[in-house]
Amino acid sequence: MKVTVIDCSVSGHRETYYKQFAQTWAGMGYETSLIAPDGKGIQEAVAFQPVSALPLLPLPAGKPLQKKLVVLRNAVIRLRNLYRLRRSLQRLNPDLVFFACLDDMLPTLAPLWLFNLLLPYQWSGLLVQSALPPYHRGMPDTRPFLRSKNCVGVGILNEYSAKDLETFQRHILLFPDFADLSAPATNYPLLRKLKEKARGRKVISLLGSINFRKGIKLLLESIPLLPKDEYFFLIAGKSSLTAQQENDLRAFGESRNNCLFSLEKIPDESCFNALIAESDLIFAAYKQFTGSSNLLTKAAAFRKLVIVSRGLCMGRRVEQYGTGQTTGEDNAGECSAAIRSLCTETKMNTQAFARYAHEHEVEKLITCFNQISKHIQ
């Protein structure tokens, strides 16, 4: 059986996904090809082809009219991308097309017959953001396309969203939110700088793509509530902030002796893991974030406590497994108290970390892929 894995994202997070998906299918004995931005590091058994898809336009914040126009333009881009992919797939003629991120590849506004015409292959994939607002007929939404006659199963990362999706697709599979656990880099300049500046203080880190949905405002409001001589704060990752927001963030960091803010992309997963390993606490109190994050998997693997927002997927998991604490998204007093408690009072529960890490082991993909393959005709 021939499987083609497809993705169009250039982010490091997504690169981890599509390469691992391709290598898992190949490792299971399937003839596997990968259509994606980067094929470096994949095994020889996977045939690589660069993707020609156009990137989706970012949605403007705080501009509802412009946002609607961008949604419509993205709907057209999605259909054009499927048309381009169809030509590539005709040459490969796979038995299964597997999308590493259905969120970016499924249409949002189109008749189902047109989608089936553009993608006349059996398909499956991962729906990364599966906890979506209530469905309203006629509104831009990927979920109706999960009803396609060619869909043989959909993977999700958020177990709490499964029931709502069963209306659109009966074969819903819970994927592990696996992570690249490469050995931490030892010669990363930012790591050396962190060690020099922290000087033994407790390190609280916000890592990854830097935007205000990551809870930056909450963290900045919490920092002054904690003693400078006991706590050190790291923000590191590629910024999607405006120039003014970046200037304000840098000014805040430079005004204090317990902050290090680096708004450059973390070079690779080994460097990312080095920053996690050097941290005492991982800050992941994201704002209105309904999904899963493999940052929790990394934190568990490196035995690091986390602080997350209460109530949604990540908060429910942290409370269930006991790998950290939750906080209100807009409560700096509660957040700073949780930071203090996690850094000074909470006992390390190694079994809790081990349970969480085991639940999200990459090897569990094989079970999921076997379930998908059973439905291929």
Give the label of every model feature segment.
Residues 330, 343-376:
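A charged, aromatic-enriched C-terminal amphipathic alpha-helix characteristic of glycosyltransferases
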Residues 124-133, 140-191:
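Donor nucleotide-sugar binding/catalytic pocket of nucleotide-sugar-dependent glycosyltransferases
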Residues 274-291:
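Acidic donor-binding loop of glycosyltransferase active sites
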Residues 194-214, 220-223, 233-235:
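Conserved donor-binding/catalytic core segment of Leloir-type glycosyltransferases
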Residues 246-270, 274:
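Nucleotide-activated donor-binding/catalytic signature segment of Leloir-type glycosyltransferases, i.e.
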Residues 281-282, 305-309:
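Short hydrophobic beta-strand element within catalytic cores of glycosyltransferases
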Residues 4, 67-78, 84-108, 122-124:
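Short N-terminal targeting/anchoring amphipathic segment
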Residues 40, 207, 232-247, 265:
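Glycosyltransferase donor-sugar binding loop
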